[in-house]
Amino acid sequence: MQKEIKMSNITEIMTLIEFPEEAVAFFQELYSEFEKDELLMSKLVSLRELYFEKFFCDELTKELSELYEKTGYHKHSVDMMFLLFSAIRLEKIYAQKGYSKQFFIHNIKDLCYKVLECKKVLGIWGIMNFQWQEGLFNLSRFALGRLQYNYYKNLYDYNDTVKKGDDVLYIHIPSSGPLLPEDVEESFRMAYDFFGPTHGDKLALMSHTWLLYPPMAEQIYPKGSNSRLFYERFDILNQIEDVNDSNIWRVFWKKTNDLSLLPTQTGMQKRLYEFLKSGKHTGFGYGMLLYKPEK
């Protein structure tokens, strides 16, 4: 007889992934609005069923917008509360697939990074990119140490080994702290063990990110810095300028292109500010590498 899997409640989920106390209290209060209204709670449960069936879809977007209106809370806050409620179900799915509770916690902790981003940038407890979490909840993206990974159809031939259309691993970099070289190496090794090699005895890794944009990286990353060492691990196969500088909020924690409003308190902020002030733009780099752990 299969052992019953105990599911956490929302407060336990938030505690496990280290939400700030203020955020815990906020989402407890928001969740209580659903508990007090039988129709609202019924809607929340049915939307969770829809989410795990179809994930991000027009129907879900429409139904969630009604919850924003009925509760009076900001959409980013309701979105996060919905994901926390859905995480209760996700914990059971992880357990059924044989993953440890610690592995579940490490993966779902991305919600903590996102709630802190939203608070720092917008002053709201919530999540700015609800759709992004689909990869977490459909178990296509996994956090392994410092980085996250999912399979991806490669766009370019690389190194006479990797071909366009091959399955490779896409690296994502959560805002969970510095990119220490030893943490990056440990994560690569974990990915190699978890997914297995993709090309011979090597694992093909790629990332398409603003952090790998050569004109910016080679000007503002000091030699020997964590960011520079991460950048130098990749061969850049393509780059594109982003005239909207859509990712600078990740450094300045403000969603504005008005340079006069950008803080220059950290070294990275100062260097990126000077880069932008000179009339240059950020962009995206498509980087690849082949990884095999050292014995």
Provide a role label for each language-model segment:
Residues H208-L212:
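An acidic- and aromatic-residue-enriched active-site/binding cleft used to recognize and process polar
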Residues Q2-L179, P197-A204, P215-K295:
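Non-catalytic substrate-recognition and accessory regions of acyl/acetyltransferase enzymes
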Residues P178-F195, L205:
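Conserved acetyl-CoA-binding loop-helix of GNAT-fold acetyltransferases
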